Curated annotation (Swiss-Prot):
<dbReference type="GO" id="GO:0045974">
    <property type="term" value="P:regulation of translation, ncRNA-mediated"/>
</dbReference>
<keyword id="KW-0346">Stress response</keyword>
<comment type="subunit">
    <text>Homohexamer.</text>
</comment>
<dbReference type="GO" id="GO:0006355">
    <property type="term" value="P:regulation of DNA-templated transcription"/>
</dbReference>
<comment type="similarity">
    <text>Belongs to the Hfq family.</text>
</comment>
<protein>
    <recommendedName>
        <fullName>RNA-binding protein Hfq</fullName>
    </recommendedName>
</protein>
<dbReference type="InterPro" id="IPR047575">
    <property type="entry name" value="Sm"/>
</dbReference>
<dbReference type="InterPro" id="IPR005001">
    <property type="entry name" value="Hfq"/>
</dbReference>
<comment type="function">
    <text>RNA chaperone that binds small regulatory RNA (sRNAs) and mRNAs to facilitate mRNA translational regulation in response to envelope stress, environmental stress and changes in metabolite concentrations. Also binds with high specificity to tRNAs.</text>
</comment>
<dbReference type="GO" id="GO:0003723">
    <property type="term" value="F:RNA binding"/>
</dbReference>
<dbReference type="GO" id="GO:0005829">
    <property type="term" value="C:cytosol"/>
</dbReference>
<keyword id="KW-0694">RNA-binding</keyword>
<feature type="domain" description="Sm">
    <location>
        <begin position="10"/>
        <end position="70"/>
    </location>
</feature>
<dbReference type="GO" id="GO:0043487">
    <property type="term" value="P:regulation of RNA stability"/>
</dbReference>
<dbReference type="InterPro" id="IPR010920">
    <property type="entry name" value="LSM_dom_sf"/>
</dbReference>
<dbReference type="Pfam" id="PF17209">
    <property type="entry name" value="Hfq"/>
</dbReference>
């Protein structure tokens, strides 16, 4: 396994961003946000929804549900993620 390997969360969010995959984000309080991931860091996700940008704190997110399957092993450094 490569030491420069990206973690599964980052690989997942990055593919959502790069492929512009629509997502539903479920928050811990039960709210749902629908949109496209535009960026993320260690603590937040930027979601574009209805032409507006939302900064969502990761500690408030329970689930990220993409509208279609996400390939997190698209690049060699991701192939062993989760194994």
């Amino acid at each position: 396994m490569s030491k420069t390997q990206i973690n599964l969360q980052d690989a997942f969010l990055n593919q959502l961003r790069k492929e512009n995959i629509p997502v539903t984000i479920f928050l811990v309080n039960g709210f749902q946000l629908k949109g496209a991931v535009r960026g993320f860091d260690n603590f937040t996700v930027i979601l574009e929804s209805d032409g507006k940008q939302l900064m969502v704190y990761k500690h408030a997110i329970s689930t990220v549900s993409p509208s279609r399957p996400v390939n997190t092993s698209a690049t060699p450094e991701h192939r062993n993620v989760g194994q």
